[in-house]
Amino acid sequence: MDTTTELQPHPKTILVVDDELSVLTVVKCMLESGDYNVMLANSAAAALRIAGNNEVTIDLLLTDVIMPDMQGPDLAERILALRPELKVLFISGYADSDVVRIKVLNHNLSFLPKPFTPDGLLETVERVLNAPSSRAFAAGLNALS
C-alpha cells in the first residue's frame, strides 16, 4: 500500500484590474475555471491598496491598459516597485491605440487583445506565469520614463 501523497502546488493568485465590471466578472470566471485564485480591482487605486498588503500573495497582475484613473503600464510600474517578482499581463480592447502600441507592444510586453476566449486567456496566463522574471518587463517600463 502506497502511503505517499503527492504534494499539489498551491494555486496561483491573479490580481485582475479593469474599470469595467462585466470584464472583471467574465475574466474571474475564466480564471477560476483554470483553478486560479482571483482578486478583483475596479481601479488602479484599489489595485495599489491590494498590492500594498504584504499579507496577500499575488503571482500575476492582469491589467487593462486603458483605464480612467491610471494607465495599466503606469500601474504595473508602481506595483512592481512593491513586488519586483510579480509577472504582468496586459489586456485591452484597443490594440490599435497609441497607448497600447507605444507602452506595451513596442516593448514586447505580454499582451492579450480583447475579446479573448477562455482557452486563449488560460494559455496566455500559463505562458506568462512560466516565463522568466519580470526584470525585462521592468526594464521595458523604465525605458518609457
Please identify what each model-predicted range represents:
Residues T25-S33:
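Charged docking surfaces used in two-component/phosphorelay signaling
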Residues S133-S145:
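CheY-like receiver
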Residues D64:
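Active-site residues of response regulator receiver
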Residues V17-D18, A41, L61:
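Conserved sequence signature across two-component system core domains
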Residues N42-A46, Q71-L75:
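Acidic catalytic/metal-coordinating carboxylates
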Residues D74, R78-A81, L86-P113, D119, ...:
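Alpha4 helix (beta4-alpha4-beta5 surface) of REC/receiver domains from two-component response regulators
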Residues M67:
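Receiver (REC) domain active-site loop signature in two-component systems and cognate sites
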Residues D35-N42, I50, L112:
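Short hydrophobic/Thr-rich beta-strand motif most characteristic of the beta2 strand and flanking loop
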